[in-house]
């Protein structure tokens, strides 16, 4: 059986940047998981003493606090800056962008629509920058019956599917006088999604590696599943099962933006042993 990696996969710019920041900081606490990958979080804790807190209320004797790649809410950031703790911002620049757009458009009198998961930390952070009306949706049907003002701004969670984002944009344009559409889906997300789609079309079995709580990894898995029925989402090599590969000729592999190369290689090694 041949194993083929997607043409684009794994660590994105924002994650690489955040990990380097955490490694350089050392002896610090992150506000929420730095990235959505438990294996890498454990490595940072073991090798660099970077521990994970659930919120700013858990800060006690820490001298350094790292803001996670997904960002935090505007109010939490303000509270954090009131303390004597050194604040190290590892928010991905692609996440900072919709935060700023949300704040600017809201202040300019626009209603704001965010395409994303309202329970995701990135979306919670972006939403907190709106001073006026803001709506978080995963589907245009959720906007039915909403009475917008004359002006609406649309942004997206950075890891969502472009096709769905455009459906929501089209829905708004048919119903609102002025719509400002800001494509805040990051390039790495788009490239990884296109790559997994192209590989899944040819593969007999697909393995998508990443955190089960990772939005971008889930999107990759769903795209893969759409084109290759035998698609599996795993976090580590320990979940790989021999039966998945019986009678298969091509195994495709993709990985989420928070998945390091060392985890991917362990999965490849495990599959090659079958």
Curated annotation (Swiss-Prot):
Single biological process term from Gene Ontology: terpenoid biosynthetic process
Major enzyme class: oxidoreductase
Cofactor needs: [4Fe-4S] cluster
E.C. designation(s): 1.17.7.4
Binding site for dimethylallyl diphosphate: 36, 70, 120, 214-216, 258
Keyword 4Fe-4S attributed: yes
Pathway membership, UniProt: Isoprenoid biosynthesis; dimethylallyl diphosphate biosynthesis; dimethylallyl diphosphate from (2E)-4-hydroxy-3-methylbutenyl diphosphate: step 1/1; Isoprenoid biosynthesis; isopentenyl diphosphate biosynthesis via DXP pathway; isopentenyl diphosphate from 1-deoxy-D-xylulose 5-phosphate: step 6/6
Stored PANTHER family: 4-HYDROXY-3-METHYLBUT-2-ENYL DIPHOSPHATE REDUCTASE (PTHR30426:SF0)
Physiological role: Catalyzes the conversion of 1-hydroxy-2-methyl-2-(E)-butenyl 4-diphosphate (HMBPP) into a mixture of isopentenyl diphosphate (IPP) and dimethylallyl diphosphate (DMAPP). Acts in the terminal step of the DOXP/MEP pathway for isoprenoid precursor biosynthesis.
Name the record gives this protein: 4-hydroxy-3-methylbut-2-enyl diphosphate reductase
Organism whose genome encodes this protein: Campylobacter curvus (strain 525.92)
Gene from which this protein is expressed: ispH
């Amino acid at each position: 059986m041949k194993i083929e990696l997607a043409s684009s996969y794994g660590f994105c710019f924002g994650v690489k940047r955040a990990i380097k920041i955490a490694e350089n900081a050392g002896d610090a606490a992150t506000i929420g998981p730095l990235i959505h990958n438990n294996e890498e979080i454990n490595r940072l804790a073991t090798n660099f003493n970077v521990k994970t807190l659930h919120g700013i209320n858990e800060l006690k004797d820490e001298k350094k606090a790292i803001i996670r790649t997904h960002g935090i809410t505007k109010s939490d950031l303000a509270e954090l800056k009131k303390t004597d703790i050194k604040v190290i911002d590892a928010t991905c620049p692609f996440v900072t962008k919709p935060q700023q757009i949300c704040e600017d458009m809201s202040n300019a009198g626009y209603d704001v629509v965010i395409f994303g998961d309202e329970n995701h930390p990135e979306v919670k952070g972006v939403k907190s920058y709106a001073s006026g009306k803001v709506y978080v949706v995963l589907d245009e049907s959720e906007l039915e019956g909403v009475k917008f003002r004359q002006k609406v701004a649309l942004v997206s969670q950075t890891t969502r599917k472009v096709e769905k984002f455009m459906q929501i944009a089209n829905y708004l344009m048919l119903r609102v006088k002025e719509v400002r559409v800001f494509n805040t889906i990051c390039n790495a997300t788009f490239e990884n999604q296109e790559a997994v789609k192209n590989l899944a079309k040819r593969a007999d079995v697909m393995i998508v590696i990443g955190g089960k709580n990772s939005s971008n990894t889930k999107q990759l898995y769903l795209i893969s599943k759409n084109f290759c029925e035998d698609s599996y989402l795993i976090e580590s090599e320990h979940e790989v099962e021999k039966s998945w590969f019986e009678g298969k000729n091509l195994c495709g592999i993709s990985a989420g933006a928070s998945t390091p190369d060392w985890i991917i290689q362990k999965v490849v090694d495990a599959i090659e042993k079958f």
